Amino acid sequence: MLPKGVACFAGDLSEAEQKVVWATHAAPAADLFNQKVEGTAWKSKPSWYIVAKNDGTVQPELQRFVAKRMGATIYEINSSHVPMLSNSGLVIDVILTAANAVQRSTIGA
């Protein structure tokens, strides 16, 4: 990612936070899209997905498609690609909701 790309990736963070993102980011693995994943959990387990509606990295329409294909419980938020940084409270709430739902389903099983 070039320095100007940070605004596209994390545009809802402050300038100082964007500088930290730039300073600490790393390039993805060169063979990222050729890797085979064994045992994709979303095919057999409940899933949750946060669609970042202002994401300039992965288009929200693609995120919705993926989430629907997964059968995920979908949350949408006005966020860039990094809602875990810009909207951590919502992300924590979704994680807790998911954990509680899974816990309830295993207790009732």
Where are these regions (language model features)?
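Short secondary-structure boundary/capping segments
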Residues: 38-41, 64-66
